[in-house]
UniProtKB/Swiss-Prot annotation:
Natural source organism: Chlamydia muridarum (strain MoPn / Nigg)
Name of the featured protein: Trigger factor
InterPro entries (alphabetical): PPIase_dom_sf (IPR046357), Trig_fac (IPR005215), Trigger_fac_C (IPR008880), Trigger_fac_C_sf (IPR037041), Trigger_fac_ribosome-bd_bac (IPR008881), Trigger_fac_ribosome-bd_sf (IPR036611), Trigger_fact/SurA_dom_sf (IPR027304)
Catalyzed reactions: [protein]-peptidylproline (omega=180) = [protein]-peptidylproline (omega=0)
Keyword Cell cycle: yes
Amino acid sequence: MFSINIEETAGCVVSAKVQANPLVTQKCHKEALKTVKKNVVLPGFRKGKAPDNIIEARYATQVEQELRRFLLRASFEALSQMCDRKPLSPKAVRSSTVDSCNAADGGVVSFLYEAFPVIPSLPWEQLNLSDPEPVKEISDEDLENGLKNVAYFFATKTPVTRPSQEGDFISLSLHVSKKGDLNSNPVAIFENKYFKISEEDMTDAFKARFLNVSTGHRVEEEIASEDIQSFLNGDLLTFTVNAVIEISSPEMDDEKARQLQAESLEDLKKKLRIQLENQAKEEHHQKRFSAAEDALAQLIDFDLPQSLLQEREEILSREKLLNARLVKYCSDSELEEQKQTLLEEAKADARKAVKLLFLTQKVFSEKELSISREELQRMMDVCSRERFGAHPPKDISNEMLQELVLAARDRLTYHKAIEAISAEKKDLEVVPS
């Protein structure tokens, strides 16, 4: 019923001509007549019951439009099901044109779209996944620092009027606005966010700004970077110190340990050590997971869809530049010096991310991995909380539910594929698909 001819170019761009035989256009013609009938009323006939010949004679233009619409839809379905180079999605179609369409003779439809990439057979023997470092051993210093963090639970937090000192916490708000624009209302980037004034928690530049300042202190900074101006839709940053808070932590003892469901201070230390050991194991596992990601991404190269690369690169570029300016607190001149490096990092990270998106799908299929209903439901709950918060709406639409299912399935597919590589770093035997 259909024949398809394609031409491929770089960036996974495909041009296709879909030829439909008369059986297809005849069926589309019947659907077109049926659709037009439903929308018109003729004297002497009930709605939708007028003879076809009368409808075709009086509404030839509308019938032709519907015929082309149905042919276009049928041709895209054929392209998605029959063609080796399937479109990524309906949104991946850059253009579609009905070149010819006749109920008796058939029709031709042209498409220009981005297709799924072609991934060669994976050379597992070349997988280079090095042995990770052993799990970190918990030292007495680690345990002592952990106890200090636990002591914060009992700390006295006192707002003070004196200037801020090393070790204090400050509550900050950050707003962006347009300088000199009286109609520009400041927009919050964050409000009442707490920072500890210390070398461990602040960059030197950020710490210098907020050491020896009092409640109510304001810092205004003009943004010279056009990139940051564009991202934030403003050119003036205003930091406001809402409070300076002195923290006084007591020494831990048996009584305080019992308040934390421990029998004694020694028992609390044992439980804390177990917790720190579990954290170290999780960090070790994450390092191994990241190493597997790197190894898979480096295993093979192939052509990638340009639009996905560009979209991911734009997102990562924005994140890296904003992080440098607002988190690492680089000046505009420092940001300009680092900009090219950051953009190159974003480009490389984007390529890696898009490669892994498709490689993990291939690994999932070749390794014959599966997702249980329980796993899918748990991941859907995670995706739902990320999108809606703790209380999702009760009347979620079918479309939104489908989005959650796809998001959850994609995450699980990615995670399971990387875990499979991490668990089997040597002698991976995969049956090619």
